[in-house]
Amino acid sequence: MLDPTSERDLFDQENMEEISQLASLEMSGDVVANTNSTVVLEKPSYPDSVYVTAANIFQGIRIQRSPDKVIINYGSEPLQPSSSRSEDESFQRLSYELAFSTLKYQDILESILIDSYIFSSTTIASQLNSLIIVMLYDFQDRKFQPRILSENEETIPEVQEVENLLNGFKTKLAAALARCRIKHDALSIYHILPETVRKQEQRASTLPLYAWINTSKISLEEVYNNLRRKGYSKVKSITSVNEKVYAVDQHCFNVLIFPAHLKTDLLNIDLIKDYKLIFQDKSRSLAVHSVKALINIDDDVLMVNTGSWYTVAHMSILTSGHTSKIFVCGIQQEEKDFNARKLFTRMGCQNIEILHETFLSIESKDHRLQNVKVILLLPRCSSLGVSNPVEFILNEHEDKSLLQDLSQGGLPKDKLETLVQQQFEQLTHAMKFTKVQAIVYCTCSVSKEENEDVVEKALEYQSSGVKMQPYRLSPPVLPLCTLKEIELSMDRFFRLEPSDMNNGCFLSILTRERDPSETVSVKDVLARAAAKGLLEGVEVGKTLKRDKKRKKSKALPSRAPHHGDPLRDHLAVDGNDTSNVQMKISELLHRESKISTSTKMSAPAKTVSQAGTSSQVRKPSKPLSTPLVRNFSRPVERPTNFVRARPEGKVIPLKPIEIVLPPVIFPLSSQGPRVQMPATHFYYRFIGSKVGVPRYLTSSTSRRKEKVKESTTSSHVRHPRPWL
């Protein structure tokens, strides 16, 4: 029988082996391959200042319970953070990531603390409870290994006190953790999380980095060359995560994609430091590129709820070659105004106008916005399509209170309804601007209530408003690169579902129906084409001048055509000058009648002595009433000149149509007119046709020819019909 000391040592050893064997003590959820191994890879530890800042963040976003269900009292006084690095961006990101991870496991960590009797065994101030739970998460994530600090690292007394407490209860905490895992029948505490949260973590671990190129400071080719010199290779798609590669996005020409593991390396290159390459979520680039496709070179844009200043800068840079202005509203604090203008100057943005009013307080007839043609609306949303909420909320300056709901996999119904109402109010207010022609509505949510329902409700609501041309739903202006994207856009909405390659995104374009009384000028068409880059090397001003000259030339009398082709000659004649055309036709037919008469007198004798019945056809005593017979009898008189000038006026209705018809379906009877057809017709009338395959004219063509002939002075004048 073992003594109490040996029994305690054996219990400690068994617990430590279980801790080292199970990946439940890792948040990745993977089981250790070798269950007998006790080798544990060290994970970098956080400095004291990160723990304190993360504890204060957790204190503000933690899930608060009703008084009868309170497990741990967290106090109300925040800890004093270190002021040396509190404003550092990387420091803030580490603190928020630690606080958000703790928030996801709040229920589990609280159960472990209660089950280990740590609070009943010690007396510790309640204001340190937030620090305890944050450090416990990191402690078990590192498999209860001691933290290693650098020599010059600043130490905080409260952090040292809590660390000593957790090390003293290491065995009991490990045992409580194992019991919690067994209770939920889970391989790890990671599998206790809701499925939506687990999928979110999996996507976040592989989500690539998106960065757009600031073309006001550097060209695309210069960026490619710079990256190549630093060892990066350009590929078509990001498939390998272990190499220094990048790809160009298919939807946005100035957006590059990098594997996630390259972020630390990229942050140290000059392209990032000099604002030539900007990290930002792809959804924001999709929004600004949609606006770019809708505006002319002199149209202004109004941006609402932009969040990050990078979105405003991106819109400004895409329109840097235009005379457009980019209006951004809602910057009310002077400090934010100063920081925003400073950033815009560094990035080379020159066409941004800041409005201090909120969007809903701006009148639709504001004189400053009379040239605004497109509104970009990025409303506050639930961000349920985002895989890494911390990264997105910090970069886009979104509401940090959303982290509490996103840690549990979704928003409560009442919060979602509040967001939907705000989105509807902003969209309907945007529709009131009379000069605006299009609205781009973009969210990072996958909730139908925030996307399709809001847009459709706003479209229905507009009918009861002011009498203006209504808005309608327009198809996406972005390229659809895959079959799945095409299927998702069948209802005229652009969607990206959350995946390992991108966050979720919803984008809708509303365009005002064109007033039927208004006509689109050439200037507008050319301006739109120039804005889309379709007129490279062509100056719009010169094009407009050429167009004016063409209009003047049309007003002058039509000149004689010089093409030698009847159809092109007809197109060169003004269709309104009917009298001039008729006069030319009469002159031409009169001239050809003389030529035809002289030709008839000089015809060879052998032509007359053809078939016996052919001479009857040429008797001018009485013209045949059948148009087909008359048309076919006329070619016997072979014209002497095939390059004679051709008539202009009524040529277009007489455009020949060649149809090969078998003799058995000839429209006339088998006797009579067909017997009278001259045999010579098949040899010299249609040069180049195959022998034995005659070509006939349709009856409609013959009737048209007869009408032209009847307009002449003589009924038996036979001209060679040069247009056939």
UniProtKB/Swiss-Prot annotation:
- EC identifiers of the protein: 2.1.1.-
Family annotation (InterPro entries)? MeTrfase_RsmB-F_NOP2_cat, MeTrfase_RsmB-F_NOP2_dom, NSUN5_7_fdxn-like, NSUN7, SAM-dependent_MTases_sf
* PANTHER family tied to this protein: METHYLTRANSFERASE NSUN7-RELATED (PTHR14663:SF2)
Tissue specificity, please?
Answer: Expressed in testis.
Biased amino acid composition, Basic residues: 543-554
Query: Which residue intervals are annotated with compositional bias (Basic and acidic residues) in the record?
Result: 562-572
From which organism does this entry originate? Mus musculus
Q: Which family does it belong to?
A: Belongs to the class I-like SAM-binding methyltransferase superfamily. RsmB/NOP family.
Give a Pfam family name. Answer: NSUN5_fdxn-like
Name listed for the protein in its UniProt record? Putative methyltransferase NSUN7
Q: Keyword annotations for this protein?
A: Methyltransferase, RNA-binding, S-adenosyl-L-methionine, Transferase
